[in-house]
């Protein structure tokens, strides 16, 4: 397709989406206040006057409440979010000054998939989301908890984040793309995080979620629109990558087909048969006289059929009978006596014993043996002249059955029955021939075997180069014995017809190709289950399940440079520069990169008039010669503070500063909990009210006002019954690739891009997958022949991982 046509189509798509974005399809938005039916909610919310009268506004009171979506609303929300990469949350809010609270939260159990929070104490807006199964937080410094009305709109387009406040673009960031496929059970909360945390105090109006590009236009129609959006661009890139993959696969299949055709054109293999040491070519026929069969070699297999005997047209004075050594019956004269017809060899008892021979009854002079039974038990067998006792063993007399048949006794006679694997040749089963199960296809030999007929049975022989699996199956190689298998070292290898199968040993899980040790209680914080119920913990954690963080600072494992101090982090630590020092940009782990700040050279000192600034390690001093100008006063915010003067900072009522000899010293307000007028905002530790306590995120522990704790990579503080949490401060890094290991909160430098969590993809650095297909950097695919293995190209490196849940289900 010509490039100009593509550009025209792209312009049409963008224009159409822009128009739709301005009009906002009602099917692609959710009015949260309407869906939650706040008009009929009485506990914790009250309808009040809003910024305008076009919609209802509600006051969220400082009481326990549960404002969340009904199941049908949650399901609607899940469907709207599914596979969406463009969405905007907007609302008009008036937040109580200096408070913290969650405006909107979409969560499932403890996982926040979308959460917008405003913190008054830290003066920032926070966006919480999930990426790659891990929580992420974007902290956007802005004071919204000031008691004034604000319009807020947070827009996400793939990895592009926009924050508008009062129709002004406040922040624009690149983030990790959030997970939008919400799991079943997800719930929407308004004005709180869950039942017990994050209560918003103030008024909310016009709460909506828009699932289209440029959703902020609904709130601020005069703002500029973006086309294409980040999501549009990424969709286009993904489409190109998909087409590239499809073309590569089709090329690979075509090359394989051409190779196979070339092999077939050059291949001619005649299949022969070998019987009793003789070699027969394909379609050769021969007579197996011993077994009365006609045999033919067909494609390497012997097919035999019993000879078809011609129909006998015996004369009226003869009967067809079997003659020893012949396959077909012949006509022999019959005998008639007293109306009874006798065939050749049959006997009849008259006054004497006679046998039919050549159409004549010949007298037999054999004497009958004496009987040792009563006369009532005497019986006359068929075609015999001598009586016998009932229960007589007819089979013990002269053999009548051939070697391949067995004699069976009956009341008055004995009959012959063919043994297993044989069939009658002469009709009465006295003469039996072997059944050729191979030729008759009555065998159970599987692939890679040759059926070999044996007297009364058959055998499945492996073709050359194959080994036996069982009585009926063979495999090409002894994969298990030779080590030519792909079973995990913790799997059991079994040879099969197709090659081999792998089964994980007890205590391990997987598909046999990959077997992972199974620990019933799991290994926390990135621990590895190395053997059944045995964890190996990563550095920084300990315990049988790696559940305990090691405080490297408190345990004395770390010795930071004297220009820095040790700060413990979950699973790690870092040396933070002390006051008066800053990092030189190399960010050494031990703090050696902390160097003195020269306040004199930078003119950040407070020395006044004729006093001279003298730089000191970690600070400065003011040296003034004697004279009237050496007052020791301090310049501050464009004014002057006198030597010895004490004051409270205008922007921080909890900090007290003093001027001494030209230098300003600031500290937190000293707290006297015995003073009934103590400021509880600055001295929360003096607040003993039960209502000022905070429940931690697990709902298991209470904290007093002023207490601090760490939870899920966030630093939390309880202030007058309100818990405010913000992301832990992490040290800066100067490396190309970083990774946050499981259980840790801060990134570390890694040299392998496969380990990197945050990576800038260079589309010039492509990868070749196992099938020879070229992949762009950032592309993700499933490994051929391994549906549970996912691979990604990271700047020229192929990085693959195995999904254990998938292995267990396949």
UniProtKB/Swiss-Prot annotation:
Ca(2+) binds at residues 434-435, 437, 453-454, 457. Its main location: cytoplasm. One of its GO terms (molecular function) is calcium ion binding. Pfam families: EGF_3, EGF_CA, Laminin_G_2, VWC. Transmembrane segments: none annotated. Residues 57-227 form the Laminin G-like domain. Disulfide bonds join 395-407, 401-416, 418-432, 438-451, 445-460, 462-474, 480-493, 487-502, 504-515, 519-529, 523-535, 537-546, 553-566, 560-575, 577-594, 600-613, 607-622, 624-630. Residues 1-21 form the signal peptide. It is found in: Cytoplasm; Nucleus envelope; Secreted. Plays a role in the control of cell growth and differentiation. Promotes osteoblast cell differentiation and terminal mineralization. It has been demonstrated that ROBO3 binds to both NELL1 and NELL2. However, NELL1 is not expressed in the spinal cord at the time of commissural axon growth to the midline and has no significant effect on commissural axon repulsion in vitro, suggesting that NELL1 is not a functional ligand for ROBO3 in commissural axons. It remains possible, however, that NELL1 functions as a ligand for ROBO3 at another spatiotemporal location. This is Protein kinase C-binding protein NELL1. It comes from Mus musculus (Mouse). The gene is Nell1.
């Amino acid at each position: 397709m010509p490039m100009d046509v593509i550009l025209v189509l792209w312009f049409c798509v963008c224009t159409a989406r822009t128009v739709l974005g301005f009009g906002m399809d009602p099917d692609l938005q959710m009015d949260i206040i309407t869906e939650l039916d706040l008009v009929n909610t009485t506990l914790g919310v009250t309808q009040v006057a809003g910024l305008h009268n076009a919609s209802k506004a509600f006051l969220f009171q400082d009481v326990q409440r549960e404002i969340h979506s009904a199941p049908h609303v949650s399901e609607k929300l899940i469907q709207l979010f599914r596979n969406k990469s463009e969405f905007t949350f907007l609302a008009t809010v008036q937040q109580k000054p200096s408070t913290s609270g969650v405006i909107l939260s979409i969560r499932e159990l403890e996982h926040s998939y979308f959460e917008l929070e405003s913190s008054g104490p830290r003066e920032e807006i926070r966006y919480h989301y999930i990426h790659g199964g891990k929580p992420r937080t974007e902290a956007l410094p802005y004071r919204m908890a000031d008691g004034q009305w604000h319009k807020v709109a947070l827009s996400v387009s793939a990895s592009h984040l926009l924050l508008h406040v009062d129709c002004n673009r406040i922040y624009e960031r690149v983030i990790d793309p959030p997970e939008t496929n919400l799991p079943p059970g997800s719930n929407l909360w308004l004005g709180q995080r869950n039942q017990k945390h994050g209560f918003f105090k103030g008024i909310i109006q016009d709460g909506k979620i828009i699932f289209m590009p440029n959703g902020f236009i609904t709130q601020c129609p005069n703002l500029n629109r973006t086309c294409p959006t980040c999501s549009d661009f990424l969709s286009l890139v993904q489409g190109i990558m998909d087409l590239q993959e499809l073309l590569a696969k089709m090329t690979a299949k075509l090359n394989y087909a051409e190779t196979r055709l070339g092999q077939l054109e050059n291949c001619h293999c005649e299949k022969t048969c070998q019987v009793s040491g003789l070699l027969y070519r394909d379609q050769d026929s021969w007579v197996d006289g011993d077994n009365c069969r006609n045999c033919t070699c067909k494609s390497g297999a012997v097919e035999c059929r019993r000879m078809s005997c011609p129909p006998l047209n015996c004369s009226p004075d003869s009967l067809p009978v079997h003659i020893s050594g012949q396959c077909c019956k012949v006509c022999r004269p019959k005998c008639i006596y007293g109306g009874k017809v006798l065939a050749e060899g049959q006997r009849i008892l008259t006054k004497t014993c006679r046998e039919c021979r050549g159409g004549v009854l010949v007298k037999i002079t054999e004497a009958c043996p004496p009987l040792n039974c009563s006369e009532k038990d005497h019986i006359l067998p068929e075609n015999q002249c001598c009586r016998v006792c009932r229960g007589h063993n007819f089979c013990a007399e002269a053999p009548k059955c051939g070697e391949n048949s067995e004699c069976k006794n009956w009341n008055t006679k004995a009959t012959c029955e063919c043994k297993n694997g044989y069939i009658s040749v002469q009709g009465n089963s006295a003469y039996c021939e072997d059944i050729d199960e191979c030729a008759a296809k009555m065998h159970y030999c599987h692939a890679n075997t040759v059926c070999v007929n044996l007297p009364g049975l058959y055998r499945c022989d492996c073709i050359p180069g194959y080994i036996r699996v069982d009585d009926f199956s063979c495999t090409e190689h002894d994969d298990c014995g030779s080590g030519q298998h792909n079973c995990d070292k913790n799997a059991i290898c079994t040879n099969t017809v197709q090659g081999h199968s792998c089964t994980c040993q007890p205590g391990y899980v997987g598909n046999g190709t990959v077997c992972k040790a199974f620990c019933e209680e799991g290994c926390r914080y990135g621990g590895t289950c190395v053997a059944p119920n045995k964890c190996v913990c990563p550095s920084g954690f300990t315990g049988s399940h790696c559940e305990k963080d090691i405080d490297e600072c408190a345990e004395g494992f770390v010795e930071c440079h004297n220009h820095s101090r040790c700060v413990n982090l979950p699973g790690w630590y870092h040396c933070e520069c002390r006051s008066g020092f800053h990092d030189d940009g190399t960010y050494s782990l031990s703090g050696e990169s902390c160097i003195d700040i020269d306040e004199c050279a930078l003119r950040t000192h407070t020395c006044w008039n004729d006093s001279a600034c003298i730089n000191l390690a970690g600070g400065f001093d003011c040296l003034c010669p004697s004279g009237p100008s050496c007052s020791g006063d301090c310049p501050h915010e464009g004014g002057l503070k006198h030597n010895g003067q004490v004051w409270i900072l205008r922007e921080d009522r909890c900090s007290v500063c003093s001027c001494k000899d030209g230098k300003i010293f600031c500290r937190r307000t000293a707290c006297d909990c015995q003073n009934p007028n103590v400021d509880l905002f600055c001295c929360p530790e003096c607040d003993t009210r039960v209502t000022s306590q905070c429940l931690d995120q697990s709902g298991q522990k209470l904290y007093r006002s002023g207490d601090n704790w760490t939870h899920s990579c966030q630093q939390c503080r309880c202030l007058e019954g309100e818990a405010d949490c913000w992301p832990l401060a992490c040290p800066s890094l100067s490396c190309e690739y970083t990774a946050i290991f499981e259980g840790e909160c801060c990134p570390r430098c890694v040299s392998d891009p496969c380990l990197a969590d945050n990576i800038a993809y260079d589309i010039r650095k492509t990868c070749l997958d196992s099938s020879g297909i070229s992949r762009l950097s950032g592309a993700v695919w499933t490994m051929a022949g391994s549906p549970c293995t996912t691979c990604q190209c990271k700047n020229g490196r192929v990085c693959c991982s195995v999904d254990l849940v998938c292995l267990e289900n396949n």
